[in-house]
Design a protein with these regions (language model features):
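Cys/His-coordinated zinc-finger cores
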Residues: 126-128
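Right-hand nucleic-acid polymerase module
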Residues: 1-122, 132-270
């Protein structure tokens, strides 16, 4: 394990056809730990929101493809649930009925769902991402309590970040989201002390000059760079870099395929 006073850590998630990562300093001062500045509630709220969006985006990229479905469910007048508990129970029963339909086809249902209050009318509705295999007419008909609109899950070069932002938002939702237990949970690979300050300076300069794609695509040859950003922390003077990449043979697929990278040993590996 790296034992220096300060080192740079590279944390990488490979989720289907997409990759995202962060490069940031880790401080290991001996003796008494330095006091940390507690973020304001507003800053912490924004950080929590950003982390929730990243978590959900990775989850979708790891489990769903363009063959899967985005579903919007509403209630007709007179069918609206009166409480949060009733809304969750209705959605759970709907998911249970879908599972039986999938099982008859020899398929396993995967899903991510959330329940929302309408911004203007306050009416409850649901958003669901679910695995394909059952025809969309049946999926909509099984709902039976109002309007159901299904469409193919759409990916762009950044994946489903826009959809993840919408679902992961905190306001108007009962809770951020629910998910089935059979989802693949994204794993983080960490590389400690393998990038020195000269490397960080090279990345900063490349981002400033607009040539950052060369550095990242050389490091991860199976992927194309979508975006890379960096900022300086005014308190600890460290440089923080975030990057997003897409597989070169991009298909919108979440099929698990190993990523080809420059040979490195993750931290903690024997």
């Amino acid at each position: 394990m790296y034992t220096g006073r300060t080192f740079n850590r590279e944390s990488v998630y490979v989720c289907g056809d997409y990759m995202d990562g962060d490069i940031y300093p880790v401080f290991q001062a001996p003796g008494k730990r330095r006091s940390r500045c507690k973020p304001t509630s507003e800053i912490q709220q924004k950080l929590n929101q950003k982390n929730a969006e990243k978590k959900l985006t990775r989850l979708v990229h790891s489990n769903f493809t363009e063959d899967d479905i985005a579903l919007h469910l509403t209630y007709r007048p007179g069918e609206e649930p009166q409480t949060e508990e009733e809304a969750q129970r209705i959605l759970s029963n709907y998911i249970r009925r879908l599972k039986r339909r999938y099982a008859k086809l020899g398929l396993e249902l995967k899903y991510i769902s959330c329940t929302e209050y309408g911004k203007t009318n306050g009416k409850v509705h649901h958003h669901v991402i679910l695995s394909g295999g059952l025809d969309r007419d049946t999926i909509e008909k099984v709902w039976g309590l109002g309007y159901a609109n299904s469409k193919r899950l759409q990916f762009n070069e950044s994946g489903v970040t826009g959809l993840a932002h919408y679902i992961a938002k905190d306001k108007h939702f009962f809770k951020r989201w629910n998910q089935s237990r059979n989802l693949t949970i994204p794993q983080c690979a960490q590389f400690d002390g393998q990038l020195n300050m000269d490397d960080i300076a090279d990345i900063e300069e490349a981002i400033e000059c607009g040539t950052q794609w060369q550095w990242f695509e050389d490091r991860y040859p199976d992927f194309q760079l979508v975006e890379a950003t960096c900022y300086k922390n005014n308190i600890n003077r460290g440089t923080y870099i975030h990057f997003e990449m897409r597989r070169r043979e991009w298909s919108g697929s979440s099929a698990a395929r190993p990523a080809r990278m420059k040979k490195r040993t993750p931290s903690g590996a024997s």
